[in-house]
């Protein structure tokens, strides 16, 4: 059913963010508690927000199940909530997400060769744009932290601004995930972001940029990245760990049931979402 959620496109939240110099948080929600923490906090702060899941997170909750709670919650929200499928690695799963009603797709072909990345992403853009949906691509490679700090020349994996301009022109993507010293998961070494690179990529591509591996970066890192052209910041590890801390707090307080633990879990996650939204500056923008 074509409903209001289809109007809540990635571009509807990211283009004003890019123009207004603030960032929009994208938070993965692998269960209803996470979804509630994200959406309720966004409503309280009057902030546009993006929610979804990633292919790598599907063991926690399969795509069709995620769609069952997430899309209706997004539709009923009093602020714009864009439902996004993150790090789609296979064409089939991306298609399933579109079929289920996700309004934007990140098709991650960043480990493929440059030409293959362009070819695959351009095809996804063609499909999504025909359906009135949006696409995020990735250029350069945002790895995980297991090996990130140990690379001989980490900048070999960084996004090149000239190449980024070519990639955007040839694929037609709506937003671009960049590799600028960021990595997924917990940082083994303090990350050093290349802000000048972000600024040049933003200038040359003209589209909203996306920062993956946001958990573990400093407040200053986020603020500067947003100032230089990042419009979407992905957060999962921080909110995931907060949920666990909330449960531990509930157990320590003597809670004896799953039901009793839920408010603790939600409150702990809401605190992280709140901090991030205020940090990115998207509060009051909805």
What are these regions (language model features)?
Residues 57-59, 112-114, 239-244:
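Short gly/pro/ser/thr-enriched loop/turn and capping motifs at secondary-structure boundaries
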Residues 29, 83-89, 208-219:
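Glycine-rich beta-to-alpha transition loops that act as phosphate-gripper elements at the mouths
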Residues 1-6:
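Short, small-residue-biased leader/transition segments that mark boundaries at the very start
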Residues 218-286:
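C-terminal alpha-helical cap/extension of soluble enzyme domains
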Residues 7-26:
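N-terminal amphipathic alpha-helix/helix-capping segment at the start of soluble metabolic enzymes
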Residues 12-14, 30-52, 56, 64-77, ...:
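Alpha/beta enzyme core
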């Amino acid at each position: 059913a074509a409903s209001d959620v289809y109007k809540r496109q990635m571009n509807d939240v990211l283009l004003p963010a890019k123009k207004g110099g603030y960032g929009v948080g994208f938070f993965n929600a692998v269960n209803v508690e996470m979804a509630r923490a994200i959406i309720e906090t966004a409503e309280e702060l009057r902030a546009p927000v993006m929610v979804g899941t990633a292919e790598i997170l599907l063991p926690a909750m399969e795509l069709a199940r995620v769609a069952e709670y997430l899309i209706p919650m997004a539709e009923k929200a009093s602020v714009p909530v864009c439902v996004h499928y993150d790090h789609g690695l296979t064409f089939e799963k991306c298609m399933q997400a579109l079929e289920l009603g996700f309004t934007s797709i990140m098709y991650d072909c960043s480990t493929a060769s440059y030409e293959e990345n362009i070819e695959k992403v351009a095809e996804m853009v063609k499909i999504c744009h025909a359906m009135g949906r949006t696409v995020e691509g990735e250029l350069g490679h945002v790895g995980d932290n297991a090996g990130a700090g140990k690379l001989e020349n980490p900048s070999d994996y960084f996004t090149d601004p000239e190449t980024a301009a070519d990639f955007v022109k040839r694929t037609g993507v709506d937003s671009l995930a960049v590799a600028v010293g960021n990595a997924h998961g917990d940082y083994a070494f303090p990350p050093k972001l290349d802000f000048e690179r972000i600024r040049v990529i933003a200038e040359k591509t003209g589209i909203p940029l996306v920062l993956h591996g946001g958990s573990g970066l400093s407040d200053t890192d986020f603020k500067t990245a947003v100032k230089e052209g990042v419009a979407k910041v992905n957060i999962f590890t921080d909110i995931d760990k907060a949920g666990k801390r909330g449960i531990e707090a509930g157990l320590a307080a003597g809670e004896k049931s799953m039901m009793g633990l839920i408010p603790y879990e939600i409150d702990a996650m809401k605190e992280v979402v709140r901090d991030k939204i205020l940090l990115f500056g998207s509060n009051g923008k909805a």
